Regions:
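N-terminal secretory signal peptides that target proteins for export/translocation
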Residues: 1-2
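Bacterial N-terminal signal peptides
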Residues: 5-16
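Hydrophobic transmembrane signal anchors and adjacent membrane-proximal interface regions, especially
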Residues: 7, 88-94, 146, 158, ...
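Short, flexible coil/linker elements and helix-boundary hinge sites characteristic
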Residues: 14-16, 81, 191-192
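C-terminal/domain-edge helix-coil "capping" segments
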Residues: 20-26, 32-35, 48-50, 55, ...
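Structural recognition of the beta-strand scaffold that forms the well-ordered cores
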Residues: 26-29, 64, 115-117, 150
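N-terminal segment of the mature soluble domain
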Residues: 38-115, 181
Length: 231
């Protein structure tokens, strides 16, 4: 019975410690630049968010949630006039009139630690090269301090194979590549690789035999010198 009691206590403490170490990150919808090629059959904003979300949720000790205007905390803030509805649209990585990042302001309403907001700068498909390209820029922002932890700008490309005709295959490949690059850049700041401690070199034991031989040789030489000096 006592063992069970202590096991429960330890499990609760461990769970609490783990939760305390986990940071929450909100992922905002992207704004779109003028170089985004419109297409009806491929929603690049949704696809890019899905791909990046899949990358970010693999970062250790980071819990990722997507921004939704229907979140109860956001709904309550609108009802209490703590934020206007028109401030809930991208771009989120722009500063408000008071100098705060919009992403940080909205993130504070969600009570999260981090926010990532950005823009799809370019998205197009070249039928001549049979290639899709996408460029995404963005900022990882500390919601508590309002500081930018890291800014990123990455591109991804996808090309159709010789036997492929569906252009969305190239688009999906391009989105996957850029999401992987952005995710890697954020992972590097949020969960840097642990450096393995260098192996200490073994302390070399003194060679007693060599020491004794050296002392003996020195004594013989010294004796010969002293003996010769007597004549």
């Amino acid at each position: 019975m006592v063992r069970t009691y202590w096991a429960v206590i330890i499990a609760c403490l461990s769970l609490g410690w783990s939760a305390a170490q986990t940071r929450e990150l909100v992922l905002f919808p992207f704004a779109q630049g003028a170089a985004v090629q419109p297409t009806d059959e491929f929603n690049v904003n949704v696809e890019a968010l899905n791909a990046l979300y899949a990358q970010l949720k693999e970062i250790p000790s980071v819990y990722v949630l997507r921004f939704r205007e229907t979140n109860p905390s956001i709904t309550r803030a609108i009802e209490e006039n703590r934020i206007r509805r028109d401030r809930l649209n991208p771009p989120f990585n722009e500063r408000e009139a008071d100098g705060t990042w919009r992403a940080a302001r909205v993130g504070a309403l969600l009570d999260v630690d981090l926010a990532f907001a950005g823009r799809i700068e370019e998205f197009s498909y070249d039928p001549t090269k049979r290639e899709a390209i996408i460029t995404i820029s963005g900022d990882l922002i500390d919601v508590r301090t309002g500081e930018v932890i890291v800014s990123v700008a990455e591109s991804g490309r996808g090309r159709l194979g010789s036997d492929q005709e569906d252009v969305n295959i190239a688009r999906i490949a391009a989105v996957a590549e850029v999401a992987q690059k952005v995710g890697a850049a954020l992972r590097e700041r949020l969960a840097p690789p642990v450096q393995q401690p260098t192996q200490p070199q073994e302390e070399r034991r003194p060679d007693r035999k060599r020491e004794r031989a050296t002392v003996t040789l020195f004594a013989i030489i010294l004796g010969a010198v002293l003996g010769g000096s007597q004549f």
